[in-house]
Amino acid sequence: MKSKVQKKFFKTTPIALALIVSGYTAAPHAIEFNWGDVEGSFNSQITAGSSWRVEDSDAKNAGVGNGGLPGNTPTGDDGNLNYAKGDAFTQTIKGLHDLGLTYETEEGITFGAFVRGKYWYDYALDKNDVIHGSGTNNYVANQPINNDDFNNLTKSKGVALLDAYIFTGFYLGETAVDLRIGKQVVNWGESSFIQGGINAVNPVDAAAFRRPGAEVKEGLLPVNMIFANVGLTDNLSIEAFYQLEFEPTVIDSCGTYFSTADYLAEGCNTLVVDPNTGLTDKGLYDAGIYATRGTDEMASNDGQFGVAFKYYAESLNATEFGLYYMNYHSRLPYASAEAGLANTLVPGQGYTYGQAISSPFVPVGTDLSGLGTTAEQYNSNYHTVYPEDIQLFGLSFNTTVSEWAVSGEVSHRLDLPLQINGADLLASALTGDPDSPLTPQYKEAAAGSTVDGFDRFDYTQSQLTFIKFFDKALGTDRITAVAELGYGHVWDLPEGDDDIKYGRATVYGKSFDGIGDDDDGFTTSDSAGYRLAVKADYRNVFAGVDLAPSVAWSHDVYGYSPEPQGTFQEGRTGVNLALKANYLNMYSMSVSYTQFGGDFNPLSDRDYVSVAVGISF
């Protein structure tokens, strides 16, 4: 028989909670079939939807040459400037299909396979003109974004295989064993909303989550791995995985609505550099004041593995405890630079870009004098790095207290990379700003060598989650309430005025130029925030129609977490108001409004509304 851990009484995984909050209902009209002794099911979801911007852009979120505030840089504002209030930034039709097959022998051994795939087409991304342009089309305005070189999952149209694995379940004596091999998702830990905890096995597809009517299963990227779950005793089980490949998180592509970096995503190979010229992105590009992307440093396919022990303590209020260890490579990219090649120029003499003959981005005839730059800087380029071998240790629990489901976790990472402030990094590597604390290490680096744009620190994060169901309350069939609190701490982080600064979106400028805000928004030792969500279910309101209004609220109260994850950013807020209608558990329609806030949140002026309709069968 299955161990108590494997058939546990209550378990709210991140996916399960997301389904609760979103109002998702598994398709009851799935096609079920038998092929001899093989049982199968085929599920389909077709969705069409659109999203529109409902707020004007704010000058605080744009580079100074693009109409932004003094001190702001032009390296993270393309997505903001491309869409005016009222513009549709996505108009998508998509399909999601999965096939499951199961076969059980007379001895009770189970074999099976599961495959899931999706396809999509986004008319707005493919055909709609944008106002500002991006580096992918040389900042030519009033034409569609060129997404030809984007990651396949962020393009305007595509087909993708998600899950694809085989599995088996059997007994070794009294020991239950489950094995899965192939592209799959593994969920660990107890976090429901707050990122940066134990649940770090799989990367995320940000573009999928941006599309109207998104499901959690569309946005978690399966990875080829071997996974095993073994019931060691009636109360103790062990889980383990070994990944067979490295897959990065898919971030928002440059120029698209939610992008906050114009140069990091795949296919975004141009970085305009503004050495205090005040030019627009188009002006900088036409003047040749831009850097090109070098060769990205992808992580190895080897060395990612983890093990978890789950113990079910029935005598301790039926509590499950978890103990975790994982070694993984960063799913998120870190900006770094390559030290330039020296030219034989006389110090202190004015030069034109044309004299820096090996520069990849300088036009002939532009005077370099007074910019405080050297030939070495103008031979630099930038690229992204995926740092390897981050070790994670974790503890978790979940139980019930009165009628509340209560869970929590603590995770500790050894050698977590912290992104150096991007504006400081780029100013040092590409313009040689003499005031930057980073410039000396670029000047001292060997020509052609990589100077990492990150330093490593240990990081601890803890979270508590509370879930409560209120049945037949306030005229509803059920109200679901969720609250989650989180706190993070970076160990031994230097925070002096002259120390290197970490984090903060590049659009908000450098930490040392005395223009704009030099002091706030950078990574701090401590940070905290909370998330709240409430959903009401009204069943069969009329003629088989179910209604599910919901509200979700997020608030980062204190401090700034390590970037690029950026779990907590002081003052950052978000609210989502939604109403979903479901007819006969087959047809659905949803309407939502999302609002952002925060002083150092580049999305703070990108409120939007979404509408989606779908069919499940």
Feature names for model-found ranges:
Residues 605-617:
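Outer-membrane beta-barrel "beta-signal"
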Residues 90-92, 326-328, 333, 407, ...:
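Detector for outer-membrane/organellar transmembrane beta-barrel domains
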Residues 29-42, 55-57, 99-113, 167-179, ...:
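Short loop/turn motifs that connect adjacent beta-strands in outer-membrane beta-barrel proteins
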Residues 48-54, 119-123, 127, 183-187, ...:
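Transmembrane beta-strands of outer-membrane beta-barrel pores
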Residues 107-262, 529, 558-559, 568-573, ...:
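Outer membrane beta-barrel
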